[in-house]
């Protein structure tokens, strides 16, 4: 490759999580995690939610499927932890400093997908 190349700009990746029921997942993320419901495919097999700079797609899958893990940075980890606990999120690992130096907690959705919410 000779000479300078123009590089386009990319944004954050958007995960697509496997779920049994897209509408149920959207409702859970809205009520327990503070996301806004975005769109739903007319067939109901794919949909989205968003919050701040995070967007998540859901795709209906039949079990068994492999749940996924994603890391989400929280600028104010204490406030985020308190907010999600108060809203009924399923926190499966409490807020603590991990051996690798991050303060983090783990949230699990209704389909077993997990989010490691962390800060430096």
Predicted features and spans:
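Conserved active-site tyrosine of GNAT-family acetyltransferases
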Residues: 25-30, 84, 109-112
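Short, charged/polar, Gly/Pro-enriched secondary-structure boundary elements
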Residues: 53-57, 66, 112-114
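C-terminal structural segments of small proteins and small subunits
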Residues: 97-101, 106-108, 118
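A beta-strand edge to alpha-helix "cap/lid" segment located at domain peripheries
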Residues: 74, 111, 118-120
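Vicinal oxygen chelate
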Residues: 12-20, 48-50, 61-87, 103-108
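Core segments of cupin and vicinal oxygen chelate
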Residues: 10, 16-55
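N-terminal beta-strand motif that seeds the catalytic metal site of vicinal oxygen chelate
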Residues: 1-26, 68-70, 119-120
């Amino acid at each position: 490759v000779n000479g300078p190349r123009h590089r386009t700009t990319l944004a954050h990746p958007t995960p697509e999580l496997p779920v049994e029921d897209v509408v149920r997942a959207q409702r859970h993320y809205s009520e327990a995690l503070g996301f806004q419901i975005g769109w739903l495919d007319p067939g109901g097999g794919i949909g989205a939610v968003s919050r701040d700079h995070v967007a998540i797609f859901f795709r209906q899958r039949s079990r068994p499927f492999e749940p996924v893990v994603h890391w989400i940075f929280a600028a104010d980890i204490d406030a985020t932890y308190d907010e999600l606990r108060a809203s009924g999120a399923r926190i499966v690992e409490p807020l603590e400093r991990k051996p690798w130096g991050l303060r983090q907690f783990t949230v699990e959705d209704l389909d077993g997908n997990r989010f490691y919410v962390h800060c430096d």
